[in-house]
Amino acid sequence: MVSRNTIQTYAVALTFALMASMAQAKTITSDVFDTVIEGGRVMDPETNFDGIANIGIRRGKITHISTERLKANRIIDASGLVVSPGFIDIHSHTPTRLGEHLSVLDGITTQLDLEAGSYPPTDYGYQYKAGAQLHYGSSVGHFAIRGLVMDNSTQGYFFSEDGFISLGGAMWSQPATPAQVNEMREHLRNGLQLGGLGIGVLLDYMTEAVTESELSMIFATAAEYDTPVYVHVRRGMPGDPTGLDEVIALAERHGVATLICHITHSAMGGIGVWLSKIDAANSRGARITTETLSYLAGGTSIAADVFVNRDWRAIFDIDYEDVQWVPTGEWLDEKRFLQYQREFPTSSINHHYVKEEWLVEALKWPGMMVSTDALPAFDLEVKTNPNIAGTYAHFLGRYVRDLGVMPLMDGLRRITLLPAQWLSQASSVFETKGRIQVGADADLVIFDSETIAARAEYGDPYQPSVGIAHVLVAGRPVVVNGSQVEGRYPGQHLLTPLDAETKR
């Protein structure tokens, strides 16, 4: 593990490097940049630089940071506003045009599905193939490979042009044979060689199906490629850490970087115990981290395993009246719940069970990242959860500013630098994201820290956030004065560059 002194020394060195780059820029202000962001409060979570500066951008990169006036073809006035690295969403399930629209208005410049993943990862985000306003990518989806091997399903993601994936096949409920496990291993290797950003494992959706040997194979394969695993752990009774213990043991045994998905929604009232277990494992040399949402309900399919085959009311400590039908916002009773489960098994519900004090406790953990876990959204007529539109404005407005859970710089670190640093274990493309430094990618958010807030709510999920003025992706504005710029697609499909020496 890296010592605290080493980290502090590195941070000081980075700060001096940033100051040097600013000083250097004073001698070359005659250059004309593609874009200059002028007069904003620049906040870089890696160096802790926090000051008024001008940023020069050329060819999608930050090339100068200066207190001097810079010339540019486009000047963005950021006076009175914070200039932050773009927000990196590591856990989203909505690579759609509507999802993209609401994401950029919430400051998201990179949208990833690492929990579920896809297979092959090169096919992820079919709606973005003609161009994307944000960067996007996925892990290698174990669930999709399981479907291919066990059900001959070629559906590589939750949805495609042919519709939604079925939740009724053998892939969700049946143990695999040793031969099938070996076949899955080869597909996982193929997905990683195609550039998948690690391996995503929806373990809780197939609790009775995935054996210890199959799960161990997944971690062993990740170890071959020194790439992360992202796990939705098996869920027990409220607070039961057995599912976490299982994953920690595998992460330590195989030496694999492991992310526990939406820990607050899995740990519930046991969040303190769960985080202490992660701390203990990391003190022994493990590489384990986690993330949470900024909204309190869970969202998933009404036909998910936990709602079909297990005692979900005991597991979540709720009842039918705590469940909301996502497409319309209707609150359910037992009769309506069972009817919708029969008639619309691929549709979603919000189950309201997380308490805010659990979330606040999670956010106080220094390594906690924040993600959306946004459900698929295609049009305004069919509702989804508010995470899609308001996650980051809600986090910065309510938890950072209003409740004071952490300082603004630390809040920005959770949604920019920490995801970028973690994902550098999967792909070198993240080494220049999540920072405001010379040479970094010009993925930037400009917002008003006094007014940023979410308007999206359960039952009214498509209200865009307020307080976010401008968003740049690869140096090109995709949000200007709070409005999306139509027809501008600077986003890239992010994959892992292959390295013949290391297989990555």
Outline where the language-model segments fall:
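Active-site microenvironment of metallo-dependent hydrolases
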Residues: 5-6, 12-15, 22-53, 58, ...
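Conserved beta-strand scaffold positions in the cores of enzyme catalytic domains, especially
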Residues: 36, 75-77, 87, 136-138, ...
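Metal-associated gating/positioning segment near the N- to mid-region
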Residues: 68-70, 77-131, 251
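Conserved short loop/turn motifs at secondary-structure junctions
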Residues: 91, 203-208, 233-238, 262-268, ...
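Short, acidic/polar
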Residues: 95-101, 180-190, 242-243
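Divalent metal-dependent hydrolysis catalytic cores, especially in the metallo-beta-lactamase
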Residues: 101-122, 133-144, 192-207, 225-234, ...
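Active-site-adjacent beta->alpha loops and helix N-cap segments on the catalytic face
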Residues: 119-124, 209-218, 243
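Active-site neighborhoods of metal-dependent hydrolases
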Residues: 149-210, 248-252, 256-408
